């Protein structure tokens, strides 16, 4: 149980991509005071968590209404996860110029969605809830742990950014990218195995 919790927490922490999004937060919030930055980070993280919970609560029923199958969830989640992994592995040293256009305080977009909770996070979460390998309580517990670790990471965004520097953060982000790419491949293999009943063995 603890091993599964650790694996899921690591997966969701990588999906929240708080380390990879540090330059984005630093660039968007640099004009605000430290106290204001902390309030914005907390608010945006809460928005991101509520968005994910909203999809967990109502998303499954909605997709069942559309007759979306488990293999479709797994395959789509794998593709989105793979796309996110490729973007993480191809990350560029600085994104500050991209966000100079935002003059006002960011509310929900782009920090809560899609920077913290994006399509890959939502689809992967729904896929894990739908396939039933892990108890839903375990998945929700892992999400809350990953969210808490992500919040702590973002609270110290400026300090971590200075400590590791751009190259150090890039190395960490690419390491997470490789892990996500492997998870994406596993999800797609699960989808093919389930759809065609070919007996692919997947460790829980």
From Swiss-Prot:
It is found in: Cell membrane. This is UPF0056 membrane protein TC_0241. It is a multi-pass membrane protein. The keyword Mitochondrion does not apply. GO terms for cellular component: plasma membrane. Its main location: membrane. It holds the Pfam family MarC. Keywords: Cell membrane, Membrane, Transmembrane, Transmembrane helix. The chain crosses the membrane at residues 8-28, 46-66, 68-88, 107-127, 138-158, 176-196. Belongs to the UPF0056 (MarC) family. InterPro entries: Multi_antbiot-R_MarC. The keyword Endoplasmic reticulum does not apply. Disulfide bonds: none annotated.
């Amino acid at each position: 149980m603890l091993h599964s919790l650790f694996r899921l927490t690591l997966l969701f922490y990588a999906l929240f991509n708080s380390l990879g999004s540090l330059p984005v937060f630093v660039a968007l919030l640099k004009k605000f005071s430290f106290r204001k930055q902390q309030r914005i980070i907390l608010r945006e993280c809460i928005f991101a968590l509520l968005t994910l919970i909203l999809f967990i609560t109502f998303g499954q029923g909605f997709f069942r209404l559309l007759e979306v199958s488990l293999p479709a969830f797994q395959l789509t989640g794998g593709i989105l996860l793979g796309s996110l992994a490729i973007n993480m592995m191809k990350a560029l040293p600085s994104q500050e110029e991209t966000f100079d256009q935002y003059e006002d305080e960011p509310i929900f977009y782009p920090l809560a969605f899609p920077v913290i909770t994006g399509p890959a996070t939502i689809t992967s979460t729904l896929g894990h809830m739908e396939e039933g390998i892990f108890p839903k309580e375990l998945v929700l517990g892992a999400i809350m742990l990953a969210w808490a670790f992500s919040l702590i990471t973002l609270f110290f965004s400026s300090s971590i950014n200075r400590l590791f520097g751009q190259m150090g953060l890039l190395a960490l982000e690419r390491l997470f990218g490789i892990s996500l790419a492997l998870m994406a491949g596993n999800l797609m293999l699960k989808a093919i195995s389930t759809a065609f009943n070919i007996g692919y063995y997947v460790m829980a």
